[in-house]
């Protein structure tokens, strides 16, 4: 039984990490052709998002500038103007294709996220015994660490999350989440989240140290404050 208890967390962790990713990737590949066919036949506007709309507007502004350039060079030969209009037409067609492709990817990414969330929720509900074993394994692992290693780990984690260079990492992660879910890239919202998350995490950490660590391991708190200073 102890051997089974020791080996259980590793396949369970591996399945949590790789199984949702593998299933969602397979679902993505198998559903891609159907979504492309459905989108091309229906051309629904339901999934229009601000990110793609902004890109389309930027590209159409460029095309408008080309049309203004066309008006300025009317003294050129008709052949030259005809070639210019053909080029603008091809660029417009390419823009529409890119717009549709981005919408298709948005639908697939959204479906993949739902699948991953569903699988992880099923793990948390059905794998209660494995979660208990994993929790006991983590507690035993942390208990065997020295107070110096624990303090160093806490200090390293806090510096990564709320350190001097942490806003760059938060900005990157929030931007990836926005892009993955199709939200509009708003600099004000991202700046607000980047400035808020580290403060919240710092407050929670200080409360945890004051309420929990002071009671469980006062020596760890002393070492942590000494290393932090």
Curated annotation (Swiss-Prot):
The record, for InterPro entries, names: CemA
A Pfam family that this protein carries is: CemA
A Gene Ontology biological process term: potassium ion transport
Instruction: Name one molecular function that GO assigns to this entry.
Output: proton transmembrane transporter activity
Look up the domain of life of the source: Eukaryota
List where the protein spans the membrane.
Answer: 7-27, 106-126, 193-213
UniProt keywords (A-Z) are: Antiport, Chloroplast, Hydrogen ion transport, Ion transport, Membrane, Plastid, Plastid inner membrane, Potassium, Potassium transport, Transmembrane, Transmembrane helix, Transport
Coarse class of the primary localization is plastid
Q: Give the record's membrane topology.
A: Multi-pass membrane protein
Q: Enumerate the catalysed reactions.
A: K(+)(in) + H(+)(out) = K(+)(out) + H(+)(in)
Question: According to its UniProt record, where is this protein located?
Answer: Plastid, Chloroplast inner membrane
GO CC, sorted alphabetically, is:
chloroplast inner membrane
The UniProt function text for this chain reads:
Contributes to K(+)/H(+) antiport activity by supporting proton efflux to control proton extrusion and homeostasis in chloroplasts in a light-dependent manner to modulate photosynthesis. Prevents excessive induction of non-photochemical quenching (NPQ) under continuous-light conditions. Indirectly promotes efficient inorganic carbon uptake into chloroplasts.
Entries under HAMAP family matching the protein: CemA_PxcA
> What does the similarity note say?
Belongs to the CemA family.
Name of the protein in question: Potassium/proton antiporter CemA
């Amino acid at each position: 039984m102890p051997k089974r208890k020791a080996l259980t967390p590793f396949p369970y962790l591996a399945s949590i990490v790789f199984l949702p990713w593998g299933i969602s990737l397979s679902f993505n590949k198998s559903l891609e052709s159907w979504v492309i066919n459905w989108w091309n036949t229906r051309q629904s506007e339901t999934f229009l998002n601000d990110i793609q709309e902004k890109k389309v507007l930027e590209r159409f502004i460029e095309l408008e500038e080309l049309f203004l350039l066309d008006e300025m060079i009317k003294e050129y030969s008709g052949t030259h103007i005809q070639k210019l209009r053909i080029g603008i037409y091809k660029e417009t067609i390419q823009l529409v294709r890119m717009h549709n492709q981005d919408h298709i990817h948005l639908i697939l990414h959204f479906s993949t996220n739902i699948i991953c969330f569903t699988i992880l929720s099923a793990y948390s509900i059905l794998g209660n015994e494995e979660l208990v074993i994993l929790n006991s394994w983590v507690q035993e692992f942390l208990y065997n660490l020295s107070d110096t290693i624990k303090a160093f780990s806490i200090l390293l984690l806090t510096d990564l999350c709320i350190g001097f260079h942490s806003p760059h990492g938060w900005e990157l992660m929030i931007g990836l989440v926005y892009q993955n879910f199709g939200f509009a890239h708003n600099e004000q919202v991202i700046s607000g989240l980047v400035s808020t998350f580290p403060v919240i995490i710092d407050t929670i950490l200080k409360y945890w140290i004051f309420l929990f660590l002071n009671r469980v391991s006062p020596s760890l708190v002393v070492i942590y404050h000494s290393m932090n200073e």
